Amino acid sequence: AICVHGRTRAQMYQPYADWSIIKAVKDAVKIPVIGNGDVTGAQSACRMIEETGCDMVMVGRAALGNPWVFREINAYLSESCRIMPPPSVPERILVIRRHIELLCGDKGENRGMREARKHVAWYMHGLKGAAEMRKKAGELCTLEDLDCLLKELYTLSNH
């Protein structure tokens, strides 16, 4: 298989990915093609496959703080366009806690928590009070700090 991104490195994140490049590669080769670029969820994954003929899609930035995007895409593509509900706040909290716990287990709490700040901030996108939660995520130093933030997130979500 070959993976093709619809943008050059020099373009970085702008403009939108040019999916016609992916289609041109797919039309030119006989091996599976994986399309990448601006796949943000189930509908964009489906649209990319329809527009380019690619065999699979690759998700990049859309997975940051949203590991559920893979579940969403799989359900949509394999279950007749089934739309998955977004994860509940308790589910998000469990995943955040486990992710950061594993990160700290691998890198030590001090280094792990410094790296965790960006991950926790990504997980907060779209939630009630997200801006304030992201600010607090930038100040996390310990797993205990994370637990306090997650309790606050849970409380906010229930009001």
Task: Give each language-model segment a name.
Residues 8-15:
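Short, small-residue-enriched loops and turns at beta-alpha junctions
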Residues 1, 13, 20, 24-35, ...:
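Alpha/beta catalytic cores of nucleotide-metabolism and tRNA/nucleoside-modifying enzymes
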